[in-house]
Amino acid sequence: MIQQDPGALYSDHLAVLFRRAEQALARGGFDHLVVPSGTLHYQVFDDRDYPYAVNPQFKAWLPLTRVPNSWIVFTPGKRPAVLFHQPFDYWHVVPDAPSGWWVEHFDIHIIRKPEEALALLPADPSRCAILGEPQSALGSYVPNNPAPVVNYLEWHRGSKTPYEIALMRQAQVLGVRGHRAAEAAFRNGADEFSIHMAYCQAVGQDATELPYGNIVALNEHAAVLHYTELGRKAPQPLRSFLIDAGASAHGYASDITRTYAARGHDEFAAMIAAVDAAQQQMCAAVRPGFDYKQLHVDAHLSLMGVLKDFGVIKVSPQTALETGVSAAFFPHGIGHLIGLQVHDVAGFAASDEGGRIERPAGHPYLRLTRVLEPGMVVTIEPGLYFIDMLLNEVKDAGHGDAINWDRVDFFRPYGGIRIEDEVLCTEGEADNLTRPVFAAANG
């Protein structure tokens, strides 16, 4: 596994962004692309701010995630500018002076107060496509987020540049480091909060730096898809552990899930192994031209095959799919685009002009409906869960006879299983970004 230097790839990445921005501006009829980094948000009736989250459109250009009140200005034919907010402040740590692989490519203007940007932004705000949230408005420079510009940029963000893939590989390395520490803590009998802390320590990122809230679920808690409570006391006995957690690398996310059985719980361990084998086949199906919607449907059939083999369902996988039984055990989508955002944008877009590709009927939580293209990075995250609310709905719909309820009772205390990798669609075979990192770490 070779890690490429992102700095050596940045110039080509920027050239791609230039071309995209020029075309997007032409589509929208604007002269300038203006991207604010975002501002701090404060809690209601309080002077405490929420953790700052940078505008994704900003960090697409710069590997900076902690520079509120800054701006990027791109005008075709001109060198892009960065208005870098570095205030005089003795209450807080201010951003370091600009440095790194990006600085030589921009005209950099240091501003000490947010309003100093006004003299450096393009003269006519009406000629600017300003991409950001309303709170980023400064004087007459109010984010307008023109649809032709946003649609074009978001669609093409689906195809990652080599620079972006290099950073995503870095995020995998960090995430796997945390996952290994978390598994070790679980094996030592730790509670959910302690497992979470072991993860953060290994990654070197706290909860505000991680790309999403860690899901650290012991036993039945794994049946809550987005369980983030972090219990302070380990259940007894410990049966199972599901962890869905990622890491950030210069604004790019990883999103990795693993499930483990405690020692002595061999049948659940065998089910995990079966889901893992099925998941690897799904990862291999990531090829250019393949419809992600079909991959999702195929995942349902494969997972129902696992349940059939373990005696949980009595009907065929196809019947389970057609009757909605499969959705009770696998109630989320097979995955999503990932990159600057965990659930990256334009997953439903019909083209770079907009439009929408709807989800298949009966699958309301699928987050990607596009045909796969080279450069896309997607998650593949099949799961099987024992969720009473959904299983009761199967009974209410008259399909209770399709399920062996004794087997459900056996597996319910384990909560569920989810296995998730990130996979790069190439011109040929799928490139799993996650598995080789685990293999190297375990080697």
From Swiss-Prot:
Binds 2 manganese ions per subunit. PROSITE patterns: PROLINE_PEPTIDASE. SUPFAM superfamilies: Creatinase/aminopeptidase. GO terms for molecular function: aminopeptidase activity; metal ion binding; metalloexopeptidase activity; phosphoric triester hydrolase activity; proline dipeptidase activity. NCBIfam families: PRK13607.1. Keywords: Dipeptidase, Hydrolase, Manganese, Metal-binding, Metalloprotease, Protease. The keyword Transport does not apply. Its EC number is 3.4.13.9. This is Xaa-Pro dipeptidase. Splits dipeptides with a prolyl residue in the C-terminal position. The keyword Protease applies. Mn(2+) 1 binds at residues 255, 336, 381, 420. PANTHER family: XAA-PRO AMINOPEPTIDASE 3, XAA-PRO DIPEPTIDASE.
